[in-house]
């Protein structure tokens, strides 16, 4: 009986976690803080983490299909079959180094202005970083043609 109760509580926690991620509520808190509502990001670390998390996720969303396509088309090539590893590494390493700095800059501007950031703004800034990197990378390839 106790095991069933514990399993039921674990399922509630997992459902709550999934709901939290899907609803963009990165930081759950009670409304006894200085933030305007439960979903706004007020501290520098919360804003930085929100933007950084979305930058990493969106970068992987861009790079994972490219790596899978490269793996499918180049799997029999002697040297080029290792290109998907490079694509995946760039999808992870880029946001880890560049995304950390740009996310900190965005969060610093918000903190210096004394504004709080909504979770949707963190999504827009994070995905925007990856989108700009994608566009610049594509334009650099076109410039070499």
Swiss-Prot record:
Residues 72-81, 139-145 are cytoplasmic. Glycans are attached at residues 31, 37. It holds the Pfam family Tmemb_170. Residues 1-50, 103-117 are lumenal. May regulate membrane morphogenesis in the endoplasmic reticulum (ER) by promoting ER sheet formation at the expense of ER tubules. This is Transmembrane protein 170A. It is a multi-pass membrane protein. Keywords: Endoplasmic reticulum, Glycoprotein, Membrane, Nucleus, Transmembrane, Transmembrane helix. Belongs to the TMEM170 family. One of its GO terms (cellular component) is nuclear envelope. It is found in: Endoplasmic reticulum membrane; Nucleus envelope. InterPro entries: Transmembrane_pr_170. It comes from Danio rerio (Zebrafish). GO terms for biological process: endoplasmic reticulum tubular network organization. The chain crosses the membrane at residues 51-71, 82-102, 118-138.
């Amino acid at each position: 009986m106790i095991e069933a109760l514990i399993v039921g509580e674990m399922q509630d926690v997992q459902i709550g976690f999934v709901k939290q991620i899907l609803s963009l509520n990165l930081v759950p808190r009670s409304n006894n803080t200085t933030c305007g509502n439960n979903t706004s990001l007020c501290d520098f670390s919360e804003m930085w983490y929100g933007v950084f998390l979305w930058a990493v996720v969106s970068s992987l969303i861009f790079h994972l299909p490219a790596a899978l396509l490269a793996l499918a088309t180049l799997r029999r090539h002697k040297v080029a079959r290792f290109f998907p590893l490079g694509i995946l590494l760039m999808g992870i390493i880029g946001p880890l180094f560049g995304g950390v700095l740009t996310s900190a800059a965005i969060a610093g501007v918000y903190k210096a202005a004394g504004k709080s950031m909504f979770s949707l703004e963190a999504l827009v800034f994070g995905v925007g970083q990856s989108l700009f990197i994608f566009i610049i990378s594509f334009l650099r390839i076109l410039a070499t043609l």
